[in-house]
């Protein structure tokens, strides 16, 4: 399974997945609006185990997340919003929805410095609520009566993204420390050779150093055996 950014060529397949799985449907131009305005925030899950039949064969998209940044946030805080999330029934319970969500949230922080992300979910959608609340850590902000076209209530939810920013900063500090350590190690050994100057360990040491000289007895005078 491959998670990659949404492409404009994916939009017909996205719309098909939306119509197949969700009661909240959108016109194609609505997806295009997201793709052109915030191209970094929307992702698709592609089943790479399905081989392409020809160069014009479309990839098998089994899930997607469509997201955006709130253009004029009422609270003045930059934040993202999940417009639509869907995974085909044949590929559910594989963690795809979680991966799509986390990838989009990371992009919100890296690209737009988003402080939090919001979404709406149907009160009756138990599976989605479990994903958002239990797996991803979203908190319910408030219920919104008759939010959906069929009259069902929605829950407005929110997830603070400061923890992602801290993770990014920690990774950057770790990479900088690692690079500094490598630089220092290179400068210390530059131009130095272990076989010059003082011996280091066993390298460069005379193997005979420290041993007592061996003594041999050499006979002096006439050999008695030779005079016989």
Regions found by a protein language model. Give the residues of each.
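Active-site acidic-Proline motif in GNAT/NAT acetyltransferases
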Residues: 88-90, 94, 123-124
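Conserved active-site alpha-helix within GNAT-family acetyltransferase domains
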Residues: 98, 110, 115, 123-155
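PTP/DSP superfamily signal
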Residues: 153, 165-166
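Acetyl-CoA-dependent GNAT
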Residues: 8-90, 101-112, 160-164, 180-182, ...
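Conserved hydrophobic beta-strand within the GNAT/NAT acetyltransferase core sheet
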Residues: 82, 117-121
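Beta-rich interaction modules in large eukaryotic scaffold/regulatory proteins
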Residues: 4-5, 116
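Short, charged, solvent-exposed linker or helix-capping segments at domain edges/interfaces
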Residues: 166-176
């Amino acid at each position: 399974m491959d998670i990659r950014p949404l492409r404009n060529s994916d939009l017909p397949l996205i719309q098909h997945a939306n119509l197949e799985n969700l009661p909240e449907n959108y016109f194609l131009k609505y997806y295009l609006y997201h793709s052109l305005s915030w191209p970094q925030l929307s992702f698709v899950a592609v089943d790479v185990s399905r081989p392409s039949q020809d160069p014009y064969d479309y990839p098998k998209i089994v899930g997607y997340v469509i997201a955006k940044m709130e253009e004029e946030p009422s609270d003045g805080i930059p934040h993202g919003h999940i417009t639509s999330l869907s995974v085909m029934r044949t590929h559910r319970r594989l963690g795809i929805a979680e991966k799509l969500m986390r990838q989009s949230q990371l992009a919100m922080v890296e690209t737009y410095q988003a402080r939090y992300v919001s979404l709406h979910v149907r009160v009756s959608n138990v599976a989605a609520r479990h994903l958002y609340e239990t797996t991803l850590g979203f908190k319910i902000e408030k219920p919104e009566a008759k939010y959906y076209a069929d009259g069902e209530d929605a829950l407005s939810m929110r997830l603070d993204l400061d923890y992602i920013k801290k993770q990014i900063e920690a990774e950057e500090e770790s990479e900088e420390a690692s690079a500094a350590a490598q630089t220092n190690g290179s400068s210390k050994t530059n131009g130095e050779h272990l076989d010059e100057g003082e011996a280091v360990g066993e390298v460069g040491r005379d193997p005979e150093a420290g041993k007592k000289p061996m003594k041999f007895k050499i006979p002096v005078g006439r050999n008695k055996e030779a005079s016989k």
